Curated annotation (Swiss-Prot):
InterPro entries linked to this entry: MetalPrtase_cat_dom_sf_prd, YbeY, YbeY_CS
Protein name: Endoribonuclease YbeY
Cofactor: binding comment: Binds 1 zinc ion.
Main enzyme class: hydrolase
UniProt keywords, alphabetically: Cytoplasm, Endonuclease, Hydrolase, Metal-binding, Nuclease, Ribosome biogenesis, rRNA processing, Zinc
Cofactor section: Zn(2+)
The keyword Zinc is assigned to this record: yes
NCBIfam families: rRNA maturation RNase YbeY
GO CC entries: cytoplasm
């Protein structure tokens, strides 16, 4: 999987940037995503996170990670309008699945609050957002149990334990 990383803050260590690419590629293999899959991750500060949270979620505060899933729109492609394209073909035509915005301020706060490393927190946020982009959620206890178990399984197998 190709991951484009942008550090808007200029404060994220290169080790965290590399770890983020690696843990997302690891998670993509776990979900059997195609190698051609693409996504982006942007590291932001709390001010930008607040702005994005308000814009996309109508929530007036910063948050740790914002996940924006991208689904290709059939109207973007030229073909007979009576023709329906299979999901697999749409994915091949546009392999971009979404983007994450991770707040470096929230990552530091939460690592301290939970008593684990900053590396673990960045990994947790990246995998959490990645799973949201891939259809996982935690609105119900059942969904939460499934998502968090998979998230922990990925992080532990990768080596980011508590």
């Amino acid at each position: 999987m190709y991951v484009e990383l942008v550090d808007e803050t200029g404060q994220v260590p290169s080790e965290i940037i590399e770890q983020t690419k690696e843990v997302l590629a690891f998670a993509a293999k776990k979900l059997d995503l195609k190698e051609s899959t693409e996504m982006s991750v942007t590291f932001v500060d709390n001010a930008r996170s607040h702005e994005l949270n308000l814009q996309y979620r109508e929530t007036d505060r910063p948050t740790d990670v914002i996940s924006l899933e991208y689904k290709p729109d059939e109207s973007e492609f030229f073909f007979d309008e009576d023709m329906e394209l299979p999901e697999e073909l749409l994915e091949e035509m546009d392999p971009f699945i979404g983007e994450l915005f991770i707040s470096i301020d929230k990552a530091a706060e939460q690592a301290a609050d939970y008593g684990h490393s900053i590396e673990r927190e960045y990994g947790w946020l990246a995998v959490h957002g990645f799973l949201h982009i891939n259809g996982y959620d935690h609105y119900t206890p059942e969904e939460e149990s499934e998502m968090f178990a998979l998230q922990e399984e990925i992080l532990t197998a990768y080596g980011l334990t508590r």
